[in-house]
Regions:
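Glycine-rich phosphate-binding loops of nucleotide-dependent enzymes
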Residues: 1-185
């Protein structure tokens, strides 16, 4: 997979672009296709089923659910139980802290651990492309480096990453391509 980063000033439309691709925002005009199939008019679960998943800004974990339950929610569109278990094992291998804390409530995790959980939950859907919105926001420098290493690993594993990130230097250092959004119009 490739890593493509969108950079630009606040209000340029980076997050809106990701939300629109994910089906959370309806565009005023234009079209969105993925692997030759139109995404406009599809429900979010249909979009996830086609291999597109979003790791939202601010992580958005389900605080009152366990780490394991959060991860299982990422596979809600999948029906292949054995494959889901194999994916869960791969997620635990990539994020050992999540396995150690699988019965812990997600709301009690640190910011970096919550980001790992959000990324792991996205990987549970077995995506072809992950839309990542500000994954390093609010994290300590050690977690930022770890998150960017994981993004690179995900890409090397064959999944494309569309990355929105304020840390332009770090994002461009791992990106195969970078695009600048100038205005929000």
């Amino acid at each position: 997979g490739k890593i493509v980063t969108l950079i630009g000033s606040n209000g340029a439309g980076k997050s809106t672009t990701l939300k629109t691709i994910a089906g959370l925002v309806k565009p005023k005009s234009g079209s969105i296709t993925f692997n030759g199939e139109p995404l406009l008019g599809k429900s979010t679960d249909q979009i996830v089923s086609r291999g597109v998943t979003l790791v939202p800004e601010g992580r958005r974990v389900f605080a009152q659910l366990s780490v394991l339950d959060n991860l299982k929610l990422g596979a809600f569109t999948r029906k292949d139980k054995e494959e889901i278990e194999e994916t869960l094992l791969r997620v635990y291998k990539r994020f050992p802290r999540l396995e150690e804390r699988k019965n812990q409530m997600a709301g009690t995790l640190s910011g970096g651990e919550q980001q790992m959980l959000a990324m792991g939950r996205a990987l549970m859907s077995h995506p072809k492309i992950i839309l990542m919105d500000e994954p390093s926001m609010g994290l300590s420098p050690i977690f930022v480096s770890e998150i960017f290493d994981i993004i690179r690993e995900v890409s090397e594993g064959g999944t494309t990453v569309l990355l929105v990130e304020q840390n332009a230097k770090k994002a461009l250092s791992i990106a195969d391509r970078g695009y600048v959004l100038e205005t929000g119009n």
